[in-house]
Amino acid sequence: SNPHKITTTPDYSIADAKLLLKQTIHDNWQEVGYSADPSSSSISYNNKVVTVNGADCYVFSCSGKTFAVAVKLSAVYYAHNGEYQPLTFNNTNYLFK
């Protein structure tokens, strides 16, 4: 059993996850390595769900990069060197004090 599993939040739709990803890319595009904000570009769902840090995540592509958005909208990750790196809560210690 996973003590961190979110049980009170519904699974959100792919469309909702895409909106969160669009905003997250808009807020963090330089951090991901883009030379300009691609959030208005096409973001496409890859018809795939992966597990990252114990959470089911929808997989999306945008301007040559791959992202994973937790179905509970609890986190956004981007694929970097074969691993998913957190794009939300990545520069904070909020969860680890």
Where does each model-flagged region fall?
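Short, non-transmembrane alpha-helical segments in secretory-pathway proteins
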Residues: 3-44
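A short, surface-exposed interaction/processing loop segment used at functional sites
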Residues: 1, 67-97
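Extended hydrophobic/Leu-rich segments
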Residues: 1-6, 17, 21, 50-52, ...
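Short, flexible coil/linker elements and helix-boundary hinge sites characteristic
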Residues: 33, 47-48, 82, 91
